């Protein structure tokens, strides 16, 4: 089972809702995992769900709270395989003295792609086996700095990781939306889900 930290929002009727993105769930299923939605609510209940999962995905979203950071800290402290996407990556970075910047007048567009450069000594390079790839852009904020290892950059930090954990990797882009046509993005989910379930090599 692969847990996904759910996002909170309000319906048009004003009801509180929690959700995971379909592309995230589909990516997990494609590589043999079972997606488990995890509500960020009561701390102990959330941890109980997390401890039943082989790995955790921190999906993208608009906002986060201290509750989210506390959960991310738990994931790191307990060496639970963790993949952070967009805001998820930013939360991982913030946990380690990270600073965020804002992109003024930015328009989200999953069809817009740009090139990033991957550190050849990083886990991300081990997974993708290329030092330059194209990724999409949807974020309004970006990570200026963090004490975690920076594994990919463009004009901003694009990926971070910890070399002290079995898998603690965050990416600024949305690989789940590129699964249908980009084999390199598939490799991220294949490695993470397979490793979480069967063990990392």
Model-assigned labels for residue ranges:
Residues 96-101:
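Post-Walker A helix-loop "phosphate-sensing" segment adjacent to the P-loop in P-loop NTPases
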Residues 132-140, 160:
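Short catalytic/ligand-gating loop segments at beta-alpha or beta-beta junctions
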Residues 134, 149-151:
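A short linear hydrophobic-aromatic micro-motif
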Residues 151, 168-173:
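Active-site-proximal beta-strand elements of phosphoester/diester hydrolases
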Residues 1-87, 94-95, 107-121, 125-128, ...:
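N-terminal beta1-alpha1 cap of cysteine-dependent amidohydrolase-like domains
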